[in-house]
Amino acid sequence: MRVLIEENYREMSKKAALLVASQVILKPDSVLGLATGSTPIGMYQELAEMYKEGEIDFSEVTTFNLDEYYNLPPEAPQSYHYYMKENFFKHVNIHPARTHIPDGMAGDVEAECQDYEEKIRRSGGIDLQILGIGPNGHIGFNEPDERLNVTTHLVDLTEETIQANSRFFDSPDDVPRKAISVGMATILKARRIILLASGRNKARAIKETVSGYVSTKVPASLLQTHPEVTLIIDKEAASLL
C-alpha cells in the first residue's frame, strides 16, 4: 500500500487526476471504477480541464460506478446518476452507452445486481478503481459489519452514513435507507485501486485502513490485501498516521 500525502484538497485532487489520466493515456479503452461523494469532485474537475486542454480523450473509456441509492429516481439531484452527469460526464467526451451506474429503481433488485456484475465481467474487469472512504471506514456502501457481501448487493445504510449524507438532502428523514453497492470482492478484483481522503474527520478511518487489523468492521482495511493500492490523502486526513 502506497500512501501519498498532499498539502491540501486541491493538491490531492490534482495528483489523483494525473494518475487517472496516465491510466487512460496508456490504455485508451480503460475500464474505470468511479466513486461519488464530495471527495472526488475536485479530481473530476481536474480531469474535465485536462480534456478541454486536449490532454486526454475519454471516447473509448468505459466506467462503472460503485453505488446508487435505492428507490431514488435518477433525475433526483441527490442521485449518483445526476451527480456523475453534472460533475463529470457532461464535461468530457465519454459515450453515455459506456457509462454504468446501478439502477436504483430496478423492480427486481437481485437481477439488477447480478446483471451489473456480469457487465463488469464482460468488460474485462476494472483497470483502475477510484474509492472514497467514510468516517466509519466504509467503501462504497459496504458498511462495517460482522460479514460483508462480496458482490453487488442491496444494503441497509447505517445511521452514521445516513447522518453523514443528510447534508445533501433537506433533512435526514429524506435520505434513502437502502442502496445498491458493488461488493468488496468485486472492488478488490480491480487491477489498481486509488483511495482518496480529505479532512480531519477521515483521519481515524485512514489510520485503521493503513495500519489497523484487517477486519470487516473497517471495510477499507481489506485494501491491505490488494497488491496495487495507492492512498492519496491531504495532511488533515493523514494527521493520525
Swiss-Prot record:
Keyword entries, A-Z: Carbohydrate metabolism, Hydrolase
GO biological process, one term: N-acetylneuraminate catabolic process
Listed EC numbers: 3.5.99.6
Any GO CC annotation of this UniProt entry: cytoplasm
Pfam families xref list: Glucosamine_iso
Annotated metabolic or biological route of this protein: Amino-sugar metabolism; N-acetylneuraminate degradation; D-fructose 6-phosphate from N-acetylneuraminate: step 5/5
Active site, UniProt feature: D67 (proton acceptor), N136 (for ring-opening step), H138 (proton acceptor), E143 (for ring-opening step)
Reactions mediated catalytically: alpha-D-glucosamine 6-phosphate + H2O = beta-D-fructose 6-phosphate + NH4(+)
InterPro entries: Glc/Gal-6P_isomerase, Glucosamine6P_isomerase, Glucosamine6P_isomerase_CS, NagB/RpiA_transferase-like
Entry's Gene Ontology molecular function annotations: glucosamine-6-phosphate deaminase activity; identical protein binding
Family stated for the protein in its record: Belongs to the glucosamine/galactosamine-6-phosphate isomerase family. NagB subfamily.
Classification via HAMAP family: GlcN6P_deamin (MF_01241)
Protein role: Catalyzes the reversible isomerization-deamination of glucosamine 6-phosphate (GlcN6P) to form fructose 6-phosphate (Fru6P) and ammonium ion.
Protein name: Glucosamine-6-phosphate deaminase
